[in-house]
Amino acid sequence: MDYAIPEWVVANTNNIFPTEKGKEEIFKATWHAFILYGRQCNSLFERLETKFAYALSADLWDADEGKRIRERTAQGLAYYYGWGAFTLDSFLLGLIFNSAAKQIEQVAFINYIGFSLWDRDGRGDEISNDVLVRFTSLWEWFIEKIKDHRTDYKKVLVEFERWYQCGRFKDGGWAINQLHSLVMDDELKLTMSCFMLEDNLLEDLQQYPRKVFDIISRLVLRGDRSDTFSKNDIVEKTLEFIKNNDFPDDILLKSDKDSFINKMLEQSEAWELEQKEKLYRKYLEIS
């Protein structure tokens, strides 16, 4: 309707999305239709800003009905933030990130950014540097905001795997630095969907061998059966690279590699130990 008769929508926004007491069911019905089936465009945001705020702050949605609506509301705001409709000092970000109780919105917001930037079809679409800077600034703002109670946000922090997977934040090693910081945080003890990280970890291996090794070794030793690398050779390729190269600026990397191999073998089940020994012992400095 905004596309067909925009003047009518502008004039009737408050009637379409009423926020007065007693009209909650009307708002729920119209917001449900808009946020799930409507289109987001920059021209809409100015007149819908307070409606987004109401949808976030009002106790409108029950657990079953509301999860998808809450997710899509947060995703809509992530879209508008990326295009510069509002900034880090906006009250809207506070409504999402000021409390760990908004985990549904937080996960959806952070996940949507990484997923939407992923060039999964290989079309080579370029993303404006201004957009990328807005997102890196957002992440750094979020990390600073939760630094004293970050364990309350583990499910949100794990969504950085999408940001790393999308491959848009490589300049200056920003993405690998952020991922390394998360994975190496022993208070968080994060596990991640390793298959999302594999391709970019291999791309980063030559330039950032220590950080890639740290990430892979921590995730392998920390992960459970469902959370290992789907490409079995990523561990082998990393170990082989370290064994076959010298690292004068990191003289402990080779010995750390050997320690990792030994720990990995120690953690192996009896039925898989022989196979793993054949795979990995050849990468020890003294096999």
Model-derived regions: residue spans:
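Non-catalytic all-alpha helical scaffold/repeat segments
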Residues: 1-287
